[in-house]
Amino acid sequence: MYNLLHEQWIPVKRKTGEKPEYISPSQITDGLATNPIISLAASRPDFNGALIQFLIGLVQTACPPADESEWRKKFRSPPSPDELKAAFERYATAFNLDGDGPRFMQDLDLNLSAIDPKEKEKIEFPIEELILEMPGDITKREDRDFFVKRGTAKNICQDCCAAALYTLQAHAPSGGPGYRVSLRGGSPLTTIVLGRTLWETVWLNIVDNKTFFQYGNASKNADSDKFPWMGHTRTSENDEKTTFQDANGAQMFWGMPWRIKIVLEHSKNDERCDICGRPADSMVHTFYRTNYGINYKGGWYHTLTPYFERRKSEDNSLIPFQSEVNGISYRHWLGLIQNNPNEKIRPAKVVHLFREVRKDDLKNSGLSSTRLWAFGYKIVKGRKVLCWNDSIMPLITVNSDISQEYESSIFQLIVSAEMIKEKLRECIKEAILSQKSKLKPNLSFVELQFWQDTEPTFYQTINELHIALQSNRSFDLRNLREKWLDYLQRIALSSFDRYSQSDQIISTTNPHRIIDARVNLRKFLYGNKNLYAMLDLEKPEKSAKSLRKNLKKKEPVIS
C-alpha cells in the first residue's frame, strides 16, 4: 500500500541545493541546524497550497501544543524527525492512498465491486478531471476547451494524485446536483504565516489545543470524527447537514465533500507523470466520482481563513473570505492582516495569534516581521475556474504602544486609495460613454492596474511609518499622508489619460466628454472634502476655474 506518512512524496527545497528533493512528512525538521528545508517545491502552485495545508493539518491533528507555553518551547526547540514520525504513526491507517480498507480522502462506502458494471461506467472519469481547471463533460461535449485542452493529463503519478485529491476536497466547488462545496465554500482564500524554514511555516500556523477545541466538538474524538473516510460517509441525499458540532475540529483540514475513489495501476514501461514528469511505480488514469457527499453547514470556522460578519444576521455568523478575480494585493491588507472595521472582516486566527499573542516571543527569536502567503481558486457555478490567486505581502508587528496609531494610519492610506480608485473608474466611464449609453464596459483591468501601480509606494510608505513610530522620534504623519495623496493624485490622472483615449476600451472618443470627465476627476482629487478628511488633511481652496486652467499644465510622467 502507498502510505502518505511513510513515503517520500513531498517535493521541497533546502537552503542550499539547486534541485528539489522528496521527503516524508516527518522529515520537515530534518537538517534544521545545517541545511534546513525552506519551502515546498511542487510542480504546480495549487499543489504547494494543498501540501502546506496537509502538513499544518497533520501537525495540528497529531501533535498540537497544549497551550501557548508549549507552543513557544517547540518553536525554540523543534521536534526531531523521529519524534514527529512517532506522533504521526498513530494515524497511519488514515493515510493509505490505496488498499482494501480506508483510503485517504476517499469514500469508504463507495464499493466499486458491488456496483453494476453499467452504473459503474457512468461514474468513471479520466483522471485529469480531478484537477480543478481541467475541462469537464459539458465543456468537452460543446468543444469549448480552447485554452486548457483535454487529454493533457492522462497519466498522473500517485504523488501528484494525492496532492490533486487534497486540492479538490479543500476547494471543492459545486459540481452539479448533489456535489457539495468545501467546508469553507467554493472559492476559499487561505492565508499562511511564512517562517524562515518549512517547519517554522508549519508551526506558525498551529493553534494551541485550548483554543482549537472551540472549532469543533471535542467529545467527538474517534478517528472518523477527524478523518471522515475512516467510517461510513455522512451522505446528504436528503440535504442532511454536518455542522461543527457533528465532528472534531480537526476535520476542517480533512473535509470530504466529494465522494471519490482512486484506482492505482502499475506503470507501463517508460510511463511518466504528465504533471511532474517523473516516472513512478504506480499511475492513475481514471477515478470514480458520485454525488451527495458530506454537506458542511452551520458554524464551521477554519484557522487559516479570514471571515467577515454576515450582514443583517441575527446569529452573528461569519462567512469565509472568498478568493477574487482581480487577485490579492495591498487593498486586502484590511481583513487579511488587520481588522477591517468598514467591512467587518477578521483576519485568520493564525494571523491574529502572530500579531497579537506571539509577537513578543517571536521578536526575541528574530522574527518580528515576516510575510503572509494568500492563495486560492476563484470558481463560479458549473465548476468554472476563473483564476488561481497566489500572493505574498509583508506581515509586520509593532509594539503595543504604537499599534493603534500604526493601524489607523494604514486604514487611512488604503481607504483613500479605494476612494480615488472608485472615482477614477467612474470618470473613465464618463469619458468613453455618453449618459444615454446602455453599455456596461468591464473596467476591472483599470482597477487592477491602479492597485499594481500604487503597491510598491504603499509598502514603502508603511515601512517609513513603521520605522518612524518604532523609533519613538517625532514624526509628522501629516507630511507622510500628503506625500501619499500627491502620489495617488498623479497616478490617477496618468491612468485617466492612458485609458480614456485608449482603443482597448472603445474605438471612438469624444474630446468634450474626456475634458469634462477629467475636470470632474481633478475636482475630486484636489477638492473633495471627504477624501481630505479621510487623511486628516485640510482641503485646499481651489475654484473650478483654476482647475480648468490646470488642464493646460503638463502632468508629471509616472513610470
Question: For each predicted feature, which ranges?
Answer:
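Short Cys/His-rich metal-coordination motifs, predominantly Zn2+-binding knuckles/fingers
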Residues: C157-C160, C276
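Extended alpha-helical scaffolding segments
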Residues: M1-R141, A164-S559
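Flanking scaffold residues of small Cys/His-coordinated metal-binding clusters
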Residues: K149-T152, S267-K268
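Non-catalytic, well-ordered alpha-helical scaffold segments
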Residues: K154-N155, E200
